[in-house]
């Protein structure tokens, strides 16, 4: 099937992918635009996974103040080059992360940042709750693990559902930007203040 330049251009405009990548995706899917988007997304996220281990020492520190100065967030997000740090896509991502922190009040950046004693304390609470509810011993560990995942979704920034689209997490949002920008992106740290706390 012959793929028209206008179809390739439409796919490029909608995805931000390169011309040849769009053409190959359309050829692979027989000219189906929606399937081609999925192919590009899968390839993009595969590339994003490869970039995750790379050093990220450039980036931005972003300040967000909300509610007439009653709530503030300071977040550091790193990327690999100053060029990417200056792009609108990167700046928008950093702002969205700051809004997420302001709205959802996470306590940790990543699961690895949660202290082991906090995890053990949470597990003990969930285990006792399950026992008090009379749950069978053989399923208590699964219940505890499920509740621990919910704890991560509420307290860990990267695991939280994105406030603008809860079908993806903040980690997914970052992976999409890694695929788009071609560089590793890391949320280094954040602080959230509420007046009077």
Curated annotation (Swiss-Prot):
Q: InterPro entries per the record?
A: EF-Ts_dimer_sf, Transl_elong_EFTs/EF1B, Transl_elong_EFTs/EF1B_dimer, Transl_elong_Ts_CS, UBA-like_sf
What GO molecular function annotations does the UniProt record carry, in alphabetical order?
translation elongation factor activity
Q: What is the organism field in this record?
A: Coprothermobacter proteolyticus (strain ATCC 35245 / DSM 5265 / OCM 4 / BT)
Q: What is its main location?
A: cytoplasm
Compartments in which it is found: Cytoplasm
> Which SUPFAM superfamilies does the entry link to?
Elongation factor Ts (EF-Ts), dimerisation domain (SSF54713), UBA-like (SSF46934)
* Pfam families the UniProt entry points to: EF_TS
What HAMAP family does the annotation carry?
EF_Ts
Protein's UniProt name: Elongation factor Ts
Q: Which gene encodes it?
A: tsf
């Amino acid at each position: 099937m012959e793929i028209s330049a206008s179809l390739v251009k439409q796919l490029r405009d909608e995805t931000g992918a390169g011309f040849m990548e769009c053409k190959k995706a359309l050829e692979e899917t027989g000219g189906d635009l929606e399937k081609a988007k999925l192919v590009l997304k899968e390839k993009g996220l595969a590339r994003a996974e490869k970039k995750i281990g790379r050093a990220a020492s450039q980036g931005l520190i972003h300040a967000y103040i909300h509610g007439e100065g009653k709530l503030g967030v300071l977040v550091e997000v790193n990327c690999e080059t100053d060029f990417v740090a200056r792009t609108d896509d990167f700046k928008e991502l950093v702002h969205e992360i700051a809004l997420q922190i302001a709205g959802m009040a996470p306590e940790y950046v990543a699961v690895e940042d949660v202290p082991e004693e906090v995890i053990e304390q949470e597990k003990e609470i969930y285990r006792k709750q399950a026992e008090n509810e009379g749950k069978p011993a053989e399923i208590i560990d699964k219940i505890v693990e499920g509740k621990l995942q919910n704890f991560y979704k509420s307290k860990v920034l990267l695991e939280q559902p994105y406030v603008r689209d809860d079908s993806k997490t903040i980690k997914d949002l970052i992976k999409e930007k890694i695929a788009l920008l071609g560089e590793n992106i890391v949320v280094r740290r954040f602080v959230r203040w509420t007046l009077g706390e």
